[in-house]
UniProtKB/Swiss-Prot annotation:
Key words, A-Z: Cytoplasm, DNA damage, DNA repair, Hydrolase
Membrane spanning residue stretches: none
MF annotations from Gene Ontology: uracil DNA N-glycosylase activity
Catalysed conversion reaction: Hydrolyzes single-stranded DNA or mismatched double-stranded DNA and polynucleotides, releasing free uracil
Protein name per its UniProtKB record: Uracil-DNA glycosylase
Gene Ontology terms: cellular component: cytoplasm
Function in brief: Excises uracil residues from the DNA which can arise as a result of misincorporation of dUMP residues by DNA polymerase or due to deamination of cytosine.
Gene designation per UniProt: ung
Keyword DNA repair attributed: yes
One Pfam family per UniProt: UDG
């Protein structure tokens, strides 16, 4: 895993020294040696590199990384440029079109959001090839719980977007006297029609940011020239 060089450094290095994380690292060494694991090691902490602690405005919580070759690059819901946009993200784009009138882009690369203060955080940061949730019990949940707790300690408000039961289980770590929670159904094709479409969480997040005197998120992902 690459070294963090922004203001997450102090927070995360404290985690890295804890017993559970030392065990997690040992497990990962074995997993990467014996199986095909995503994302590439250098990308595991990508979300933290791209969105410094002090600049987090919105946390968009995912579950575990995409588990097919070339998809995952350390940002929840995002895929590399040359990869077909996955179904959940297609549904997010449909909601953005309906909510904010944005066009649906030809790629699923969400780094633009990260650079504006949207922490695209999965609750589990690695996965075996073709085995969803295969790393959900190796220690990542403790790590991401502590990341959420550290953001909760901030005085500056954070908007937490929690879709699906896995994300909503983190609600208990968030003080709603200071912070904001937008929660609902997961954008997966299995559940999107049960309340994800029409949730308007993207415009609602911007409305909150505007009221806080913060710059709104430009949610439009641009087309990539092919």
């Amino acid at each position: 895993m690459s070294k963090i060089n922004n203001d997450w450094k102090e927070i995360l290095e404290e985690e890295f020294e804890k017993e559970y994380f030392i065990k997690l690292k040992e497990t990962l060494e074995e997993e990467y040696k014996n199986y095909t694991v995503y994302p590439p090691k250098r990308d595991i902490l990508n979300a933290f590199f791209l969105t410094p602690y002090s600049e987090v405005k919105v946390v968009l919580l995912g579950q575990d990384p995409y588990h097919q070759r070339g998809q995952a690059h350390g940002l929840a819901f995002s895929v590399n440029y040359e990869i077909k946009t996955p179904p959940s993200l297609v549904n997010m784009y449909k909601e953005l079109q309906d909510d904010l009138g944005l066009y649906i882009p030809n790629n699923g690369f969400l780094e633009k959001w990260s650079k504006q203060g949207v922490l695209l955080l999965n609750t589990t940061l690695t996965v075996r090839d073709s085995e969803a949730n295969s790393h959900s019990k190796i220690g990542w949940q403790t790590f991401t719980d502590n990341v959420i707790k550290s953001l909760n300690e901030r005085e500056k408000p954070v908007i937490f977007i929690l879709w699906g039961n896995n994300a909503k289980s983190k609600e208990k770590f968030i003080d709603t006297n200071k912070h904001y929670i937008l929660k609902g159904v997961h954008p997966s094709p299995l559940s999107a029609n049960k309340g994800f479409f029409g949730c308007k969480h993207f415009s609602e997040a911007n409305r909150i940011l505007k009221n806080l005197g913060e710059k709104e998120i430009d949610w439009q992902i641009e087309n990539k020239e092919i």
